[in-house]
């Protein structure tokens, strides 16, 4: 990183600003081949394998977060040999500390705009509000070398194709509103304020306007949730590999030390109201039990279940 110091002096006083920047070349290489179209990160002319995770808010009460909290989590990502984090569109635009640390640690950031898993209006008032927010965030973050890609939303195009939305909502209205927001307003802001960075309309997707084809393993990026949501064996991960797997996973209980912070040991069981209230997945604890039963001997108690 290079440190730049700037000063502006007038008869009324002096303002100083110090910024750090990094110099690098980045592109998303989308080369056509026999499977479809690739989706490869290329840094300084060298294709890389992107290993990483989706980043969600690190605390339910984000104002409690300090720089050292980000430092601990991001250091853990680096120690796990991760080089890429996707700031998920159902969370928040992160603090300056987060991006500063990613710059320092060499972590690439896929930055979603904060739209996820829902329908959004396309009226002028809403679009103007979105444009103001997008302009603020792009202008705030564009000097961070860690950010390599802007993405319009999380799973909204996918939802159209796979969540039954086609049968619930009028296609013409939905399509028009969607395309105005994610194929006109947001890319226009990026092109004006940050033209060197790549813009991708929706994750997962093929980059097309709606209706498009949805996600496919031959092109674009993919989310795969047949393991966990679909109940498939872990081996399904090996059989469902796309060009860029930007989201997949398996739920895990937190460390016992964390559980002890909010639940007395006498109430630590899968049916207790406290444990249930902390389980936010629609499939609940039963799905965790299912996968534990598939791979491990029956746990003796709750604590052995978590461990």
Model-identified regions with their sequence ranges:
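Secreted/periplasmic carbohydrate-active enzymes, especially glycoside hydrolases
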Residues: 1-85, 104, 216, 230, ...
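Alpha-helical scaffolding within the catalytic cores
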Residues: 30-39, 95-97, 132-140
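Aromatic- and acidic-residue-enriched carbohydrate-binding clefts of CAZyme catalytic domains
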Residues: 46-55, 108-121, 137, 149-176, ...
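Hydrophobic faces of well-ordered beta-strands that scaffold small-molecule active sites
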Residues: 51-53, 85-87, 109-111, 152, ...
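The substrate-binding groove and active-site-proximal loops of carbohydrate-active enzymes
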Residues: 54-67, 80-91, 113-129, 156, ...
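Aromatic-lined substrate-binding rim segments of carbohydrate-active enzymes
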Residues: 75-80, 84-130, 136, 212-235
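Active-site neighborhood of glycoside hydrolase catalytic domains
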Residues: 104, 120-213
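Substrate-binding clefts and catalytic carboxylate motifs of secreted carbohydrate-active enzymes
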Residues: 150, 181, 188-191, 197-307
